[in-house]
Amino acid sequence: MAFKIASSPHVTRNLHTSTVMQRVILCLLPGLVVQCAFFGWGTLIQVLLAIIVALSCEAAVMKLRNRSIKASLSDNSAMLTAILIGVAIPPLAPWWMIVMGTVFAIVIVKHLYGGLGHNLFNPAMAAYVLLLVSFPVQMTSWIAPSTVALNTPSVIDSLQLIFNVGAHGGMEQFRLGIDGISMATPLDTLKTDLSLGLTTTESMAKSIFDGGTGVGWFWVNLAYLAGGLVLLKLKAIRWHISTGVLAGLFVASSIGFLLSPDTQASPLFHLFSGATMLAAFFIATDPVTAATSPRGRLIFGALIGVLVYVIRTQGGYPDAFAFAVLLANLCAPFIDYYVRPRTYGHSAP
């Protein structure tokens, strides 16, 4: 049998950390653009503010540690963390919240444990949980998508509301001053309606829902899905974790929907609501805090998907990805210990 042999050299090129981070950031852009289109300029302002704070904190910590500031900033990890925090919080959250969350992510979660490659938890999700637990009202106050809002804030309006230093912050002023802009997310709305005794069909008759998914959120998730597929094509991430997350969430939500369609949302709703695609391709795939073996990555991803469904349906926080990712981060060493690949010539561990 004749074998086809490729010409030399046979050495594959390893991607540098900065290159991987650049690719992830570029693939995030479609989702960021669509998110800004539906939820206004506030998202972009939050992202830019987070980047400034993250790079400043990164430089300050490197200076204190007598490390190269240029090398640390050029790996783009701080910028990626900042973007993930910026797109995760409500567009018109007060400025001090994004500052607090970003400082916590970079200084405490990342560098307190030794810097890039040593952190135990995903910095962006740890920051999100800190803000959500500390300021639940502000963190659950999103603005209505532009397609259903009576008024859409301009760039100037967004800046004024974000940087308002009043006691209640920009979002509170928004609720009092402009009708038809602030509202709960589809996940929050559905969970509240179900607790009041409404069926899924009755809840989804509201204007915030369209075609079984949330208005705006379907397209945001679709954009992050497109970016994630490009990321897979570029081989910046492996397919195991993303597949595990989506499969775990799909299977769990399908079982729930089949058992009780009147009180459970469809798998389509779960897959294209909240931060599902963002988390599946850009957050859960963090190589530092995830499991390492192929089989371990699948288990890690599936665990996140199942936890998301359980927390969304039984917990107090409808979009549960931050908690699910952090809990899976805790389980990653355990998964790696019991799902180690067998070394050639040795028995299984």
UniProtKB/Swiss-Prot annotation:
It is a multi-pass membrane protein. The lineage of its organism: Bacteria, Pseudomonadati, Pseudomonadota, Gammaproteobacteria, Alteromonadales. InterPro entries: NqrB/RnfD (IPR004338), RnfD_bac (IPR011303). The modification FMN phosphoryl threonine is found at residue 185. One of its GO terms (biological process) is electron transport chain. It is an enzyme of class 7 (translocase). Part of a membrane-bound complex that couples electron transfer with translocation of ions across the membrane. Its EC number is 7.-.-.-. GO terms for cellular component: plasma membrane. The complex is composed of six subunits: RnfA, RnfB, RnfC, RnfD, RnfE and RnfG. PANTHER family: ELECTRON TRANSPORT COMPLEX PROTEIN RNFD (PTHR30578), ION-TRANSLOCATING OXIDOREDUCTASE COMPLEX SUBUNIT D (PTHR30578:SF0). Pfam families: NQR2_RnfD_RnfE. Belongs to the NqrB/RnfD family. Keywords: Cell inner membrane, Cell membrane, Electron transport, Flavoprotein, FMN, Membrane, Phosphoprotein, Translocase, Transmembrane, Transmembrane helix, Transport. It comes from the Bacteria. It is found in: Cell inner membrane. Its cofactor is FMN. Disulfide bonds: none annotated. The chain crosses the membrane at residues 36-56, 77-99, 124-144, 212-232, 239-259, 265-285, 291-311, 315-335. Its main location: membrane. This is Ion-translocating oxidoreductase complex subunit D. The keyword Transmembrane applies.
